[in-house]
């Protein structure tokens, strides 16, 4: 993921979003559902109904950036709320994009090379 400025806030848009939406449609969702300005520099994260697709909308000061990710297996961990927003740290966003449960991260065993 692209490095975010230190003061950037990350917002999960709770519930599910129509993943057919692009830049303008997702910006409109951020405005209507969260009463937020999508051009303020915050990051807005949206999830589809099935839970295997995420879209991330971010205004970097020059234009809107849209990142999409689809998991080949499993679903992204998402808040139970049907509406509103949940704040994340940039580190939690990285975990979310990696498919890790950002609510309760668990250290996993990393195998070492066999000699």
Which role does the model predict for each range below?
Residues 1-115:
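Polybasic/polar functional segments that serve as interface/processing modules
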């Amino acid at each position: 993921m692209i490095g975010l400025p230190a003061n950037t806030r990350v917002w999960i848009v709770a519930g599910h979003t129509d993943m057919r939406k692009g830049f303008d449609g997702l910006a409109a969702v951020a405005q209507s559902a969260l009463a937020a300005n999508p051009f303020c520099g915050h990051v807005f994260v949206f999830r589809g109904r099935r839970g295997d697709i995420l879209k991330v909308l971010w205004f970097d000061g020059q234009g809107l950036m849209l990142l999409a990710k689809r998991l080949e297996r499993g679903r992204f961990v998402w808040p139970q709320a049907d509406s509103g927003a949940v704040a994340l740290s940039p580190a939690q966003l990285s975990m979310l994009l990696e498919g890790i449960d950002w609510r309760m991260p668990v250290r996993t065993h990393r195998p070492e090379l066999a000699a």
